[in-house]
Amino acid sequence: MLVLLNKPYGVLSQFSDRSQPPKRTLAEFGLPPDVYAAGRLDHDSEGLLVLTDDGALAHRLTDPRHKQPKTYWVQVEGAPQAEHLQALRDGVALNDGPTRPAQVRMLDPAPQLWPRDPPVRVRKTVPDAWLELQITEGRNRQVRRMTAAVGLPTLRLVRVAIGDWRLDALAPGQWRAEATTNARPSRSRR
């Protein structure tokens, strides 16, 4: 079984939490039994999360050797210049080593998304912009660290695709089951 969920902001990518006070988890969304997240989204990130009961599929989605593309819409603080975008395309030096090259483009106009609760802070004197960033790794907070490393801190991060699976019109907290015949990730073009 394969389930696509639009994980809301402020929800952990797991079904339980033992911290005090407990945080919101996937348990509140009425997901089918026996599925688990194939990969993660940070507590403060939103968007597409794939859940499955198929261990081999989960491995193909999460093992970096498979170079599964993951696409994000990223609201950044600042006005990206050509050199910022090129640095992301070339790969960024992080404290745990260089990233693989990424695909990146400006999103103009900004994507029409659901409101976030709490809203992203607005600073009238500081510009912001939206990028579409596609990576083939899945390091901890990788997109946020990449944009910060080139001088563009992330304000909002929404995953919109994993391979050929897209978020489409799923509202936050909504999910849909996909036929298992569709449960094949795309092949990376890199």
From Swiss-Prot:
Q: Which UniProt keywords apply?
A: Isomerase, rRNA processing
Pfam families given in the database record: PseudoU_synth_2
Catalysed reaction equations from the record: uridine(2457) in 23S rRNA = pseudouridine(2457) in 23S rRNA
What PROSITE patterns does UniProt report for this protein, alphabetically? PSI_RSU
Q: Which domain of life is it from?
A: Bacteria
EC number(s) on file? 5.4.99.20
Disulfide-bonded cysteines = none
* InterPro entries per record: PsdUridine_s_RsuA/RluB/E/F_cat, PsdUridine_synth_cat_dom_sf, PsdUridine_synth_RsuA/RluA, PsdUridine_synth_RsuA/RluB/E/F, PsdUridine_synth_RsuA/RluB_CS, RsuA_PseudoU_synthase, TruA/RsuA/RluB/E/F_N
Q: Which GO terms describe its molecular function?
A: 23S rRNA pseudouridine(2457) synthase activity; RNA binding
Gene Ontology terms: biological process: pseudouridine synthesis; rRNA processing
Active-site residues, record numbering mapped to chain: 42
Q: Which NCBIfam families match?
A: pseudouridine synthase (TIGR00093)
Q: What does this protein do?
A: Responsible for synthesis of pseudouridine from uracil-2457 in 23S ribosomal RNA.
Q: Which family is it part of?
A: Belongs to the pseudouridine synthase RsuA family.
Which protein is depicted? Ribosomal large subunit pseudouridine synthase E
Source organism per entry reads Xanthomonas axonopodis pv. citri (strain 306)
Taxonomic classification: Bacteria, Pseudomonadati, Pseudomonadota, Gammaproteobacteria, Lysobacterales
Q: Which gene encodes it?
A: rluE
